[in-house]
Amino acid sequence: MDSNIKPKILVDAVITWVDGSDKDLIKKKGEYLKSEKESKIQNVKTRYNQVGEIEFVIKSIIKFAPFINNIFIVTDGQSPKIIDESNSWRKEYRDKLKVIDHKVIFREFTGFLPTFNSTTIETMLHCIPNLSEHFIYFNDDMFLIKPTKISDWFKDGTPIVSGKWKKLPQKIWYYQLKYLLFPWTLKRAGFKYSQAHSAQIAGFKEKYFLTHHKPRPLLKSHFFNYISNEKKDLIDQIKYRFRNYKQYYSYSLVWHKAINNQSLILKENNDLLEIHRPHKIGFKKVISLLNKNESNNSVFALNIQSLDLVNSTDLKIILDWLKTKTKINLK
């Protein structure tokens, strides 16, 4: 894309990031985990460990989505190393990066900080100062691996969301039996369950649109219009410092409400390569999957989860692949 051509709409990127190895964060988190069960403590630990992936997330955005205006990094009093590195970048790239503290977006609700809950943090993203109406939300394990255009994310300003329709769990006999025999499983805040829960809040009674773990195109106005402005309702959502099954996914809730209002474009073809448990399948399989998708032009997004669990030798190979893929001259 010619950098001199002004896009029809401004699009920002938002990345939520935590340095799980930070001693102050570990201490702070430990104070709130004292009453938590050991199983949940382990779950929280792996969710927030990181191996420097955010460098490749940011560089992939700059390289493969040059239309992006600002790149907001939302974090808890931390700053990734790439911010220091960016001091040597050309101004046009350096000025894209903006670190936003949780206190800024939580505004009058800072009493619920610190929070270690991405579901809670996501609910407040629309409160980022100067955030564009159109933005794409990234987790720090989501990467772009091929060139993209605004039209891959928005059509005439309307978000384009890929996924597939699924029956609500309560409508499937297997889950009905499971919840009857093992009622405690209802209290697990799983990826699919939370999306189904979000759809039900939006009024869906039979099915929900299951989306993938990929960068998410969103409208700021959808958050303001579709997430309750009632203070009590918002507090009920953001009061949990760790994930809770009672919470909805804010992006899924606004998407389902947008579906009701015909202000969302759905597509069922997948443009994502998603790799789960790389520590289980081994680096050879991971690299094979990555290389295999090089020739698939429809796949432009990548998600690799739990890289912190990969052994150091395999991790270096995977990170080297990401480094090569996202290499760009920024100086």
Regions found by a protein language model. Name each.
Residues 45, 49, 79-131:
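Active-site-proximal specificity loops/subdomain of glycosyltransferases
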Residues 60-68:
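Short, acidic, metal-binding catalytic loop of nucleotide-sugar glycosyltransferases
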Residues 160-241, 245:
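Long, charge-rich alpha-helical interaction segments
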Residues 1-16, 124-131:
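Short amphipathic alpha-helices and their capping/turn segments at secondary-structure boundaries
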Residues 79, 124-168:
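GT-A fold catalytic core of metal-dependent nucleotide-sugar glycosyltransferases
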Residues 10-12, 20-47, 163:
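A solvent-exposed, charged loop/short amphipathic helix patch at secondary-structure junctions
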Residues 10, 245, 249-331:
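Long, low-complexity C-terminal extensions of enzymes
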Residues 21-23, 76-82:
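A conserved acidic beta->alpha catalytic loop
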